[in-house]
Amino acid sequence: MENKSARAKVQAFGGFLTAMVIPNIGAFIAWGFITALFIPTGWLPNEHFAKIVGPMITYLLPVMIGSTGGHLVGGKRGAVMGGIGTIGVIVGAEIPMFLGSMIMGPLGGLVIKYVDKALEKRIPAGFEMVINNFSLGIAGMLLCLLGFEVIGPAVLIANTFVKECIEALVHAGYLPLLSVINEPAKVLFLNNAIDQGVYYPLGMQQASVNGKSIFFMVASNPGPGLGLLLAFTLFGKGMSKRSAPGAMIIHFLGGIHELYFPYVLMKPLTIIAMIAGGMSGTWMFNLLDGGLVAGPSPGSIFAYLALTPKGSFLATIAGVTVGTLVSFAITSLILKMEKTVETESEDEFAQSANAVKAMKQEGAFSLSRVKRIAFVCDAGMGSSAMGATTFRKRLEKAGLAIEVKHYAIENVPADADIVVTHASLEGRVKRVTDKPLILINNYIGDPKLDTLFNQLTAEHKH
C-alpha cells in the first residue's frame, strides 16, 4: 500500500507539472520553429528574426509557465502573482529559469490564496477593489524580491548540479543508462514527472545555446514502443494481438505513448525490451550528435521530424529505427518463449459485466439516465482524449446522445455520471470524485469498454 501511495504522489506531482507545461506547449513549439529556422545554423539564417529567440526563452516561456502554475493554485489572481514571482527568479539568472518558474508560479498562487483568505472578512464595504489590488501588489513585490535574492540563486545551484551530473553521463558515454530509470517509470505513468520536471528544463537550456538538445529525446523516443507493439501484433495472443495494431498506429503516428504501457504491465518481462530499446536509441542519438529544437508533445514521429534541426535528420531516424528493432527483437523472443495461451476468459468478461451492472443495483443510478461520461488520465490530453473520441464515435453510431469528454484527474467534472480511467490511477481518481468508476487497462480495446457500451445501448433502448 505504501508503494502505491508513493507512486500516486509522484504521479500527482508529475500531473501538476504537466498541467503547467501542456497549455503552453504551442509557445514552446513556436520558439522551436523560430530557432530552427533563423539562428545562424538554421534552415533560413536571419539575424533580424533571430533576435526573437533570446527574449522568448528568457522571459516569455518561463513567465507563461509561472502564470499557469499560479492559476492552477490561486485562480486569476494566482496567475498574476505567479508571473510577478517568476520575473524575480529570471532577472539576473544566466540560464532560462524553467525550474524556477515551476516553483514560483504555484508559490505565488498559494501566497495570494492565503492573503485573500486572511483579508476576506476584514475588508470594509466599498474598499474591495483598492484592498484587493494593493494586497496583490504588495504580496507580489515581496515574492518577486524573495525570488530574486533567495529562490533564484538556490534554483540556479540545484539546476547547475543536475545539469553537470547529466552532462558527465553524456561525456562519459553513459547517457543511455538513463533508460534504466525512464522506461520503468513511464509504464507506471510517472513519465510526466520525468519529462516536464527534468528533461524539458534541461533541454530548453541546452537548446538555447546549441540550437538543439538530446534531452528532448531520451524519454520520448517512439521507437521502443513501436517495436514492442509490432511484436505483439505478430506474436501476441488473444486480446493483446488484436488490439496491438491499432495501438501501434496511434502510438507511433499520434504520439500517445500510454498505449503501450498496459502491454508491458501485462508481460512485465518486456520491460527489458523497452530498456534495451531506449538505451540503443539514445546511444544512436548521442553517437550521431542528434537533438531536437523543442520538446515533442505528443511524442509522435511527425513531431520528431518537425522539430529536428538542419543536419540532424539522420540521427533522428537512425535512433528511432534502432530503438524499434532492438525492442522488437527482444519482445518477440519473450513472447515466443511464453508457453501459456492468452485468451480472454469468461471470468474476465464476467467481471467486466459485473463492474457495470453493479451500478444498476438498488440505490445506484440507472444507466438509462447517463448523460456525461468522463475519460480521465494523468494529463487529460493523450490517452484519455483518444479513448473519449473512440468511445464517443461508437455511441454516435448507435444513436446515443451521451456526452463523452476527456479530462485531467484534477479536473473531473462534478456532473459526470461515469468516470473511465486506467486501473493504475484508481487511487488518485477516487480522491477527487465519488462517481462510479470503470477501471480499464487499455483506452481503446478494453473489454470493459465493450461491456459498458453494450449496457448503455441496451438500457437506452428501453
From Swiss-Prot:
<dbReference type="InterPro" id="IPR036095">
    <property type="entry name" value="PTS_EIIB-like_sf"/>
</dbReference>
<dbReference type="InterPro" id="IPR013011">
    <property type="entry name" value="PTS_EIIB_2"/>
</dbReference>
<keyword id="KW-0418">Kinase</keyword>
<dbReference type="InterPro" id="IPR013014">
    <property type="entry name" value="PTS_EIIC_2"/>
</dbReference>
<dbReference type="GO" id="GO:0005886">
    <property type="term" value="C:plasma membrane"/>
</dbReference>
<feature type="modified residue" description="Phosphocysteine; by EIIA">
    <location>
        <position position="377"/>
    </location>
</feature>
<dbReference type="GO" id="GO:0016301">
    <property type="term" value="F:kinase activity"/>
</dbReference>
<keyword id="KW-0762">Sugar transport</keyword>
<dbReference type="InterPro" id="IPR003501">
    <property type="entry name" value="PTS_EIIB_2/3"/>
</dbReference>
<dbReference type="GO" id="GO:0009401">
    <property type="term" value="P:phosphoenolpyruvate-dependent sugar phosphotransferase system"/>
</dbReference>
<feature type="transmembrane region" description="Helical">
    <location>
        <begin position="274"/>
        <end position="293"/>
    </location>
</feature>
<feature type="transmembrane region" description="Helical">
    <location>
        <begin position="135"/>
        <end position="156"/>
    </location>
</feature>
<protein>
    <recommendedName>
        <fullName>PTS system mannitol-specific cryptic EIICB component</fullName>
        <ecNumber>2.7.1.197</ecNumber>
    </recommendedName>
</protein>
<dbReference type="Pfam" id="PF02302">
    <property type="entry name" value="PTS_IIB"/>
</dbReference>
<feature type="transmembrane region" description="Helical">
    <location>
        <begin position="51"/>
        <end position="71"/>
    </location>
</feature>
<feature type="transmembrane region" description="Helical">
    <location>
        <begin position="25"/>
        <end position="46"/>
    </location>
</feature>
<feature type="topological domain" description="Periplasmic">
    <location>
        <begin position="157"/>
        <end position="165"/>
    </location>
</feature>
<keyword id="KW-1133">Transmembrane helix</keyword>
<feature type="domain" description="PTS EIIC type-2">
    <location>
        <begin position="13"/>
        <end position="344"/>
    </location>
</feature>
<dbReference type="InterPro" id="IPR050893">
    <property type="entry name" value="Sugar_PTS"/>
</dbReference>
<dbReference type="InterPro" id="IPR029503">
    <property type="entry name" value="PTS_EIIB_mannitol"/>
</dbReference>
<feature type="topological domain" description="Periplasmic">
    <location>
        <begin position="294"/>
        <end position="313"/>
    </location>
</feature>
<feature type="transmembrane region" description="Helical">
    <location>
        <begin position="314"/>
        <end position="335"/>
    </location>
</feature>
<keyword id="KW-0598">Phosphotransferase system</keyword>
<keyword id="KW-0808">Transferase</keyword>
<keyword id="KW-0812">Transmembrane</keyword>
<feature type="domain" description="PTS EIIB type-2">
    <location>
        <begin position="371"/>
        <end position="461"/>
    </location>
</feature>
<comment type="function">
    <text>The phosphoenolpyruvate-dependent sugar phosphotransferase system (sugar PTS), a major carbohydrate active transport system, catalyzes the phosphorylation of incoming sugar substrates concomitantly with their translocation across the cell membrane. The enzyme II CmtAB PTS system is involved in D-mannitol transport.</text>
</comment>
<feature type="topological domain" description="Cytoplasmic">
    <location>
        <begin position="1"/>
        <end position="24"/>
    </location>
</feature>
<feature type="topological domain" description="Cytoplasmic">
    <location>
        <begin position="336"/>
        <end position="462"/>
    </location>
</feature>
<feature type="topological domain" description="Cytoplasmic">
    <location>
        <begin position="72"/>
        <end position="134"/>
    </location>
</feature>
<keyword id="KW-1003">Cell membrane</keyword>
<feature type="transmembrane region" description="Helical">
    <location>
        <begin position="166"/>
        <end position="186"/>
    </location>
</feature>
<feature type="topological domain" description="Cytoplasmic">
    <location>
        <begin position="187"/>
        <end position="273"/>
    </location>
</feature>
<dbReference type="Pfam" id="PF02378">
    <property type="entry name" value="PTS_EIIC"/>
</dbReference>
<dbReference type="InterPro" id="IPR003352">
    <property type="entry name" value="PTS_EIIC"/>
</dbReference>
<keyword id="KW-0997">Cell inner membrane</keyword>
<dbReference type="InterPro" id="IPR004718">
    <property type="entry name" value="PTS_IIC_mtl"/>
</dbReference>
<feature type="active site" description="Phosphocysteine intermediate; for EIIB activity">
    <location>
        <position position="377"/>
    </location>
</feature>
<dbReference type="GO" id="GO:0022872">
    <property type="term" value="F:protein-N(PI)-phosphohistidine-mannitol phosphotransferase system transmembrane transporter activity"/>
</dbReference>
<dbReference type="GO" id="GO:0090563">
    <property type="term" value="F:protein-phosphocysteine-sugar phosphotransferase activity"/>
</dbReference>
<keyword id="KW-0813">Transport</keyword>
